[in-house]
Amino acid sequence: MVHAFLIHTLRAPNTEDTGLCRVLYSCVFGAEKSPDDPRPHGAERDRLLRKEQILAVARQVESMCRLQQQASGRPPMDLQPQSSDEQVPLHEAPRGAFRLAAENPFQEPRTVVWLGVLSLGFALVLDAHENLLLAEGTLRLLTRLLLDHLRLLAPSTSLLLRADRIEGILTRFLPHGQLLFLNDQFVQGLEKEFSAAWPR
């Protein structure tokens, strides 16, 4: 099961950019409770805990992405927004997976699958035993759909104004955090359904 999906900023490697990694969008599937914690579980406290956990994942993804780009020896990709007509080569984008130990930051061990596309990072937080190939394929599909339908890399794109469209894509392609085995024909059908509900 997927526990969270997030989109966050990526800073350019080899720069002295002191800006912080920012979570632009996150969706948590199911809540995590700590049975050993004697403090009351209020809605506000749970929300802050989830926010801290998601930010910790985003920072680690950003760090992994920067390390991978530096280690590859390739020149850093231009992180400036592109025109909406340009296709982004997802097969060349930095990607990876890593494990999170229990209590760091989640109660249970988790696996994170991530993909860095220019100035944006996309990540899925999964159960530790989840199918990584299926998760990577799902993340690539979600990323492609979000980039195509929402034009996320175009200048002046605001994710805050498009949260309902992101949720529409997640509802169809990652329902309740469940990874789906999808063939191309089924994906095309879901894309047509989404396009009819949310015209570009």
UniProtKB/Swiss-Prot annotation:
Coiled coil: none annotated. As part of AP-5, a probable fifth adaptor protein complex it may be involved in endosomal transport. According to PubMed:20613862, it is required for efficient homologous recombination DNA double-strand break repair. It is found in: Cytoplasm, Cytosol; Late endosome membrane; Lysosome membrane. PANTHER family: AP-5 COMPLEX SUBUNIT SIGMA-1. It is a peripheral membrane protein. The keyword RNA-binding does not apply. Keywords: Cytoplasm, DNA damage, DNA repair, Endosome, Lysosome, Membrane, Protein transport, Transport. GO terms for cellular component: AP-5 adaptor complex; AP-type membrane coat adaptor complex; cytosol; late endosome; late endosome membrane; lysosomal membrane; lysosome; nucleoplasm. This is AP-5 complex subunit sigma-1. Its main location: cytoplasm. GO terms for biological process: double-strand break repair via homologous recombination; endosomal transport; protein transport; vesicle-mediated transport.
